[in-house]
Structure formats: C-alpha cells, structure tokens
C-alpha cells in the first residue's frame, strides 16, 4: 500500500482553521481557555491575536447568550466549549434565543459553535 504524500495533523489543521477565521476583523473567540493556557482550546488559538479572544467563566448558558448578543451587534463569535457535554448547558440560549432570531426578524446572526469530542 502506498504512503500518502502528506499526513494531516488534527491539532495543526484546527489551529490553521482558527487562524484563517481570525483574519476577519469582526471574528471573536469566546470561551474557557482562550486567553490562558490550560486546555487544548488555547493551543489551537496560537495564530489568533489576544484582542480577538474573550475569556469566559464556567457558565455555558451565559457564554451562548453573550455570543448571541455579539452576533446581534454584527460580530462573528466563535463560541468554544472545551467538551461537547458542556454544550448541553447552553441549549436554552441556543434553542430559545439564537435559533429564533431569524424567524422573528430579517436578521441572520452568525455564530460558530466549536466543541471537542475525545482528546487531541
């Protein structure tokens, strides 16, 4: 069997994607471990300027509501949850607020939700 010409590294590709998203001046990265080292999300933001990162407390519903507000103001928040099971705690703001905005108005908010399953 032939070896592939190159190998993809998940961490490197995720870091590259976050760096690409950061090129847009209205993109903000919101979540835990965005400004302070400690978990994998910090490592993947190495190409993102600190002024585009917002550190949040452990309050997932607050984080999703905050991102909804940022989107209403024209920003493109990337809401980062360290693990997928924490996303369950943000479902109220996601399903009852963010999801309804387009139906209640002509506005289409842009929010990117990023979470991880497994380890990097």
Where are these regions (language model features)?
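Thiamine diphosphate
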Residues: 1-120
């Amino acid at each position: 069997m032939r070896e592939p010409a190159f190998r993809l590294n998940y961490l490197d590709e995720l870091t590259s994607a976050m760096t690409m998203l950061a090129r847009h001046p209205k993109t903000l990265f919101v979540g835990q471990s965005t400004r302070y080292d400690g978990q994998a999300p910090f490592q993947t933001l190495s190409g993102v300027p600190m002024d585009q990162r917002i550190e949040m407390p452990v309050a997932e519903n607050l984080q999703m509501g905050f991102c909804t507000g940022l989107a209403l103001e024209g920003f493109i928040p990337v809401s980062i949850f360290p693990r997928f099971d924490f996303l369950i705690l943000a479902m109220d703001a996601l399903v009852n607020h963010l999801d309804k905005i387009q139906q209640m108005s002509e506005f289409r908010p842009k929010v990117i939700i990023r979470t991880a399953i497994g380890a990097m």
